[in-house]
Each structure stands twice: as C-alpha cells, then as structure tokens.
Regions:
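FAD-site-proximal beta/loop scaffold in flavoenzymes
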Residues: 3-82
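Mid-to-C-terminal Rossmann-like scaffold of FAD/NAD(P)H-dependent oxidoreductases
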Residues: 55-126
Length: 126
C-alpha cells in the first residue's frame, strides 16, 4: 500500500518443520507436514498420548479468527503449558475438559533480538 514503517531491525522468522515421522508409534495420525495431530485437549488420536510444541498440529481445531499456528517458540511454550494443564485435567478424571486459553485467541509473538523488543503480529490471508 506504499506505507513506510520505520524500524531499527527486521527479522524474518518462518518457524520450524515438524518431524513427527521420527516417532515410531503405530496408528499415530500425522498431518501432511508430518506433525502429530492433536485435539483441543492436546491429545493425539491415541488415548492418554499427548503432543505439544512444534511437532503438534492443531489443524483440526476450530480456531479463533485471529489465531493460526506458525510454529515459533512462543507458541511451542504456550502449547506445552496448555498441554500440561490438559493432562492434569484428564488425570483428575472428573469428566471436565480444559477450556482453550486466551493465548489461542490472537496470534502474536514477542521476543528480543540484539537488545531490541520485537513484536510480530500477523494476519493470515486465506
């Protein structure tokens, strides 16, 4: 659109490639990019088997309109924290499930590079 945005540093980050195909568990369902598919409780298609981080795919979730998976370390950390909460909720065995955390409502990535604060906020084009 011709708009110029001044900045001190530009970092191009595209995430990582999942390698779920290295995990040799019979009947474990992988996505087309070799990520382990998980439900909204981070559980795979195998009962009591969970996956989180870059190897997990949430492609079958009903996403909030401003969130998508980009496989950056901040999302991996959020997945890990949320997966631990889901495992604990399942361990309680009270019939409840864990509600999706707010971090799955809006995709943002905040970090520091070379002493600069970096905020990445992306809108995906479908």
């Amino acid at each position: 659109n011709g708009k110029v945005i001044k900045c001190d540093l530009v970092v191009s980050a595209t995430g990582v490639i999942p390698n779920g195909d290295t995990i040799k568990i019979d009947d474990l369902i992988l996505d087309s990019d070799n990520a382990i598919t998980v439900n909204d409780q981070m559980e795979t298609n195998l009962k009591h088997v969970y996956a989180a981080g870059d190897v997990a795919s949430c492609s079958r979730w009903k996403h909030a309109p401003l969130w998508f998976q980009m496989r950056l370390w901040t999302q991996a950390r959020q997945f890990g924290s949320y997966a631990a909460q889901c495992v604990h909720t399942a361990w309680l065995d009270n019939g409840n499930s864990k509600d999706l955390d707010f971090c799955f409502e809006l995709f943002t990535h905040a970090t520091k590079f070379f002493g600069f604060k970096v905020i990445l906020q992306v809108r995906r084009k479908d």
